[in-house]
Structures are given as structure tokens and as C-alpha cells.
């Protein structure tokens, strides 16, 4: 393998000849052979948006020549097209400020930009620190790239998947408004409910999560850029942060702004904690929904079996013909992982000692993982399970007709205690509710038929 010699303030080091990174990236590769979790490419794209905006801002402020600005923008655009992904090899488990990933981007951008200048016959050279990282510090660039990446992934991946599943439940909700089934509380029989009403609860959970997500992602639009090392903005023009935010906004279509307090932006990640809290809320709702669906689909002959769900693959290596609710199991595992990630994000975000939080990569890694798991999980759950939910009306009607909790409709007519006696007698003696009610002497057959109407119980108003 061919190599070339690169150098940094520690001296010279060999770098693979076909790779565009430089000395600091190579040192990080050697110093941190930890785990297999690569720094997410999405944050590299966030960095590319930032470096692009920084070049335009520095140029506008008279700190960067036309040629250097054009070369840096060219290199960043190549990164954003996904053409340079192989040149970003670093793992999550590195310095807590993300300095090495910032330098990885600086080095690749400078390498590509210098090639561009040479091809254009321009006698200038671009330095990773002095030009690509001009007016910046890893301490304000990494959190900026974090926010750019997180906002984009919520906008383009999570929200569409959430809406997709929500729309499916809305369709099922409307379709099954005429099917009346027994409700359940405490895992015990309760008063009747429409299947459409039950599904409406699931749909509304996703509506609320959509609202919470829209609110929490607003705070991710605030960028740390301009704070440089400790929030004072040393070595940066006072307008640098505002200009970079403007250029990033123009290129992404999102309304990013420069944070009004850079000291906060470097040492606190409460905006991400809030965002991940919303992800946890969504995970909790998805856990509940998936559990409800697999319980309602349990069976086929010794479970509830009120609904059927698609049969996607064999469920057992030993029991022939067995089919399992695998999509529900997948989604509940996703929910558990997201809840665990929330703990990590919360603890990591509490570690902002003095002027800098140095747990940034793990905060980013866990939050992005949660976004991807939830987005992919909802999409596949929708396509392979939710769209195929169908009622098993024979079982639904049998449970409804056998339920003792229909007795609740007698409360206004004979009182709670007499109604309770009727239900207990029916259960103890194996009677139908109607038989027990008539035997009690408190209710005639005609009154029972008039008062016990499940269709009235699901729409009492």
C-alpha cells in the first residue's frame, strides 16, 4: 500500500496514499481503535454545511480570498453529494469535544480544495486550520454540526415515518367505527368500546408526538458557531456566527440562527435532551401500541384473537405452522433501545464541566441512533403489520356478549350495589348477565333489553 507523509504539531506520520485525510485523523485512527461505531456520516454532512457556510462568511468578512472560498465550497459540495464518505473513518469513541472529527473534515476539505486549486492553475494553498477552520474551534463546530445533522434527520426521516403510521391508524379508525368490542382496563373486562375508538387512541398518541417533535426541534435550530473556544468568540468576527447561520439556512432550507448565548451553547445540550425526551415519549407510545396489537392478535386459538395481523414469516424452528407477531417484537425492542439511549443522553448532557461539555459524540451517536431506529421501525411496522390489521368479528362478538361489565348500564336504574350483585351471581353460577339480572328480581326481561345496548354504551352522549 502506498503512503504519503503528513505532519502536524506532533511531527510527521504516514497516511495511506489513497486517502484524503491528514495527520490528526491518522493519529486518531491509531489512538482510538475502540468499538465499531463510526462517527455518523450525517454529522460529517453537517460539518460540510458548516465549513461551506464558514468559507462564505469569512470571504464576505474579507478574511478569505475568492479562490480559497470557491475551493472550500467545491470540496464541501462533494462531501454533501456523498462522494467522499470513505475518507471519514473515525469512531464515536474519541475526544469528547469531537476535535478529531472536526479535523478529519478540515483535512479532507483542504486536500480536495488544494487539488481543485492546482487543477485550476491557481497558485494558492489551503491549510486545514488556518483556512478551513478559520474563525472556528472544535468546541463550537461540533455542536453546530450536531444540530444541523439532527434537525435534518428529524425533518427528512423521522417525521415522514411518523406521519405514515399515523395515517394508517386514521384509516383503520374510520373503517372500524361500526365494530363494537369489549374494553379492557387492568387486563380485566370493562365497558364496551368501538374498535375504531380504540385505534383512535393510538392515532392520537402519534398526533401528540408529532406536536411535541415540532416543538422540540425548534430549539435545535440554534447554533453554537461563533462561540469558538469557550464562548467568547475569540479569533472570530462578531458577525461571523450570524453570517454562517444565514448561509447554512440558505443551503439547507432550514431557519438556523446563531445562539444568543454561546457559553450555554458550548457547555449545555439541553436542547438535545429535550429532543430525545420527545423520542422517548414516542418510544413509550409505540411500545404501548405494539403490545396492544400483539395481545389483541394473540392466539390463534388460545388467545384473545380479536384482530388478525399479517403473517410474514415462519415463527418457530420446532413448532410447524407457528407464526409470531414479529413486527410488534421488533418495535418493542426499538422502544427499549431508545429508552436506554435517553438515559445515556441525559447523563452525558449533565457533564458540561465549566465551559465545555466533553460527551458530545456519545450524545450525538445515541440521538441519531434513536431517530433512525424509530423512523425505520415505524416504517416497517406500518408496511408489514399495521396496514394489514383486520378484525375477527366472531371472536369480538363472543367476548362482548359474554362480558359481565355490560352490567354498568344498569347502574343508573337499579344502583351500583344491586348491579354488582347481578354480575357476581352471573360469574359465580355460570349464568349469562341477562339470566342473572332477571333472577335477581330487580330487572325484567323487557328492561334488560332496553337498558343493555352496547351501541348506546359506546356513544353515551
Swiss-Prot record:
Residue stretches in coiled coil: none
Record has Lyase as a keyword: yes
Pathway connected to this protein: Carbohydrate metabolism; tricarboxylic acid cycle; (S)-malate from fumarate: step 1/1
Single GO BP term: malate metabolic process
Keyword Lyase set for record: yes
Gene Ontology MF terms in the entry: fumarate hydratase activity
Residues of the site described as Important for catalytic activity: 329
Compartments, as annotated in UniProt: Cytoplasm
Domain of life: Bacteria
SUPFAM superfamilies tied to this protein: L-aspartase-like
EC number: 4.2.1.2
InterPro entries: Fum_hydII (IPR005677), Fumarase/histidase_N (IPR024083), Fumarase_C_C (IPR018951), Fumarate_lyase_CS (IPR020557), Fumarate_lyase_fam (IPR000362), Fumarate_lyase_N (IPR022761), L-Aspartase-like (IPR008948)
Active-site residues (renumbered): 186 (proton donor/acceptor), 316
Catalytic reaction(s) noted: (S)-malate = fumarate + H2O
Chief subcellular location: cytoplasm
UniProt KW keywords: Cytoplasm, Lyase, Tricarboxylic acid cycle
Family the entry assigns: Belongs to the class-II fumarase/aspartase family. Fumarase subfamily.
PANTHER family: ASPARTATEAMMONIA/ARGININOSUCCINATE/ADENYLOSUCCINATE LYASE, FUMARATE HYDRATASE, MITOCHONDRIAL
Subunit structure as annotated in this protein's UniProt entry: Homotetramer.
HAMAP family (UniProt xref): FumaraseC
Function of the protein: Involved in the TCA cycle. Catalyzes the stereospecific interconversion of fumarate to L-malate.
Name the UniProt record assigns to this protein: Fumarate hydratase class II
Organism listed in the record: Staphylococcus haemolyticus (strain JCSC1435)
Amino acid at each position: 500500500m502506498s503512503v504519503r507523509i503528513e505532519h502536524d504539531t506532533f511531527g510527521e506520520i504516514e497516511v495511506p496514499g489513497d486517502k484524503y485525510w491528514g495527520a490528526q485523523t491518522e493519529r486518531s485512527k491509531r489512538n482510538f481503535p475502540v468499538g465499531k461505531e463510526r462517527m455518523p456520516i450525517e454529522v460529517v454532512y453537517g460539518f460540510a454545511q458548516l465549513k461551506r457556510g464558514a468559507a462564505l462568511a469569512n470571504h464576505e468578512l474579507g478574511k478569505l480570498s475568492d479562490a480559497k472560498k470557491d475551493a472550500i465550497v467545491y470540496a464541501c459540495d462533494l462531501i454533501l453529494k456523498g462522494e467522499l464518505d470513505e475518507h471519514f473513518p473515525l469512531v464515536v469513541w474519541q475526544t469528547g469535544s469531537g476535535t478529531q472529527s472536526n479535523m478529519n473534515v478540515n483535512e479532507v476539505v483542504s486536500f480536495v480544495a488544494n487539488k481543485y486549486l492546482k487543477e485550476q492553475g491557481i497558485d494558492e494553498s489551503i491549510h486545514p486550520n488556518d483556512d478551513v477552520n478559520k474563525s472556528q474551534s472544535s468546541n463550537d463546530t461540533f455542536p453546530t454540526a450536531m444540530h444541523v445533522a439532527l434537525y435534518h434527520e428529524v425533518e427528512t426521516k423521522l417525521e415522514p415515518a411518523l406521519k405514515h403510521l399515523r395515517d394508517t391508524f386514521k384509516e383503520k379508525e374510520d373503517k372500524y367505527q361500526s365494530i363494537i368490542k369489549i374494553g379492557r382496563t387492568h387486563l380485566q373486562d370493562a365497558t364496551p368500546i368501538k374498535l375504531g375508538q380504540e385505534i383512535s387512541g393510538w392515532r392520537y398518541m402519534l398526533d401528540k408526538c408529532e406536536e411535541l417533535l415540532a416543538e422540540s426541534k425548534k430549539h435545535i435550530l440554534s447554533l453554537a458557531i461563533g462561540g469558538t473556544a469557550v464562548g467568547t468568540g475569540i479569533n472570530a468576527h462578531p458577525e461571523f456566527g450570524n453570517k454562517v447561520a444565514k448561509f447554512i439556512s440558505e443551503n439547507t432550507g432550514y431557519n438556523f440562527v446563531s445562539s444568543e448565548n454561546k457559553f450555554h451553547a458550548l457547555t449545555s445540550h439541553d436542547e438535545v435532551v429535550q429532543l430525545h425526551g420527545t423520542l422517548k415519549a414516542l418510544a413509550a407510545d409505540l411500545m404501548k401500541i405494539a403490545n396492544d396489537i400483539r395481545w389483541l392478535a394473540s392466539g390463534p386459538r388460545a388467545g384473545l384473537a380479536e384482530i388478525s395481523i399479517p403473517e410474514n414469516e415462519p415463527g418457530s424452528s420446532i413448532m410447524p405452522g407457528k407464526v409470531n407477531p414479529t413486527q410488534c417484537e421488533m418495535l418493542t425492542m426499538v422502544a427499549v433501545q431508545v429508552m436506554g439511549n435517553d438515559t445515556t443522553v441525559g447523563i452525558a448532557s449533565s457533564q458540561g464541566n465549566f465551559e465545555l461539555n466533553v460527551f458530545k459524540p456519545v450524545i450525538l451517536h445515541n440521538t441519531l441512533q434513536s431517530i433512525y431506529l424509530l423512523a425505520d421501525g415505524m416504517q416497517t411496522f406500518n408496511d408489514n403489520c399495521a396496514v394489514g390489521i383486520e378484525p375477527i368479528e366472531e371472536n369480538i362478538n363472543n367476548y362482548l356478549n359474554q362480558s359481565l361489565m355490560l352490567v354498568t348500564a344498569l347502574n343508573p336504574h337499579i344502583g351500583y350495589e344491586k348491579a354488582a350483585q347481578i354480575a357476581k351471581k352471573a360469574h359465580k353460577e355460570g349464568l349469562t348477565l341477562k339470566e342473572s339480572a332477571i333472577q335477581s328480581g330487580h330487572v325484567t326481561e323487557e328492561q334488560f333489553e332496553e337498558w343493555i345496548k352496547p351501541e348506546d354504551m359506546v356513544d353515551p352522549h
